[in-house]
């Protein structure tokens, strides 16, 4: 029994001696040992001693670089499709109302209807808002007083490639579902319609004319 105990003590002393020797070797080399389960010594080099979490959580290399935004140039007039004998060219569906919500919602309905009927929609846009002042003449005198102000909102749905045989059916559909207070008109697209989309700036035009 005593012999077995002596062997265990010898093995334990050898293990302690080896650990002490390893610790001394790490200290002389300047490395810091890290103890793990079982008493085994591990050595891990730390390249960032002052920043232990340096580089963790980087994600920018996973995101594609954003392209530089292009400057908006002057809008130019596109070539107008005049159509053929069997189908119309570019048509403008004008929807005018005093209620902006009503005009906008019905323009969306017409746009979705064209998509469901496979009618190509070139674009949908809003025209500049127009304001009309209603003046009232006094009973006595010639002075005019402001009675009310009417604001007109207009939306345009531009379509192309509408066949002549289906045009009558399409117009009947949108006219039958026309809400009260909305005025509908359909006409061919012209260059004047394109220019009418933008507000006139006479002061800027005068300055540009002087510079030229």
UniProtKB/Swiss-Prot annotation:
One of its GO terms (biological process) is mitochondrial translation. Belongs to the mitochondrion-specific ribosomal protein mL48 family. Pfam families: Ribosomal_S10 (PF00338). Residues 1-28 form a transit peptide. Component of the mitochondrial large ribosomal subunit (mt-LSU). Mature mammalian 55S mitochondrial ribosomes consist of a small (28S) and a large (39S) subunit. The 28S small subunit contains a 12S ribosomal RNA (12S mt-rRNA) and 30 different proteins. The 39S large subunit contains a 16S rRNA (16S mt-rRNA), a copy of mitochondrial valine transfer RNA (mt-tRNA(Val)), which plays an integral structural role, and 52 different proteins. mL48 is located at the central protuberance. Interacts with OXA1L. InterPro entries: Ribosomal_mL48, Ribosomal_uS10_dom, Ribosomal_uS10_dom_sf. It comes from the Eukaryota. Keywords: Mitochondrion, Ribonucleoprotein, Ribosomal protein, Transit peptide. SMART domains: Ribosomal_S10 (SM01403). PANTHER family: LARGE RIBOSOMAL SUBUNIT PROTEIN ML48 (PTHR13473:SF0), MITOCHONDRIAL RIBOSOMAL PROTEIN L48 (PTHR13473). This is Large ribosomal subunit protein mL48. The modification N6-succinyllysine is found at residue 199. GO terms for cellular component: mitochondrial inner membrane; mitochondrial large ribosomal subunit; mitochondrial ribosome; mitochondrion. It is found in: Mitochondrion.
């Amino acid at each position: 029994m005593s012999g077995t105990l002596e062997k265990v003590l010898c093995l334990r002393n050898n293990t302690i001696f080896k650990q002490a020797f390893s610790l001394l070797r790490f200290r002389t080399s300047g490395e810091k040992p890290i103890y793990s389960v079982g008493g085994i010594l591990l050595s891990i080099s730390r390249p960032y001693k002052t920043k232990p979490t340096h580089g963790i959580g980087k994600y920018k290399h996973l995101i594609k670089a954003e392209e530089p935004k292009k400057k908006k140039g002057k809008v130019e007039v596109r070539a107008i499709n005049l159509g053929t004998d069997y189908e119309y060219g570019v048509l403008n569906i004008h929807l005018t109302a005093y209620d902006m919500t009503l005009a906008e919602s019905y323009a969306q309905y017409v746009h979705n209807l064209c998509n469901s009927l496979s009618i190509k929609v070139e674009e949908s846009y809003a025209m500049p808002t127009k304001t009309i002042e209603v003046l009232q003449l006094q009973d006595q005198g010639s002075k005019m007083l402001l009675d009310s102000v009417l604001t007109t909102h207009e939306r345009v749905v531009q379509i192309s490639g509408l066949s002549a045989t289906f045009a009558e059916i399409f117009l009947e559909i949108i006219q039958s579902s026309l809400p009260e207070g909305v005025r509908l008109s359909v006409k061919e697209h012209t260059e004047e319609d394109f220019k009418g989309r933008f507000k006139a700036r006479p002061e800027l035009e005068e300055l540009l004319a002087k510079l030229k």
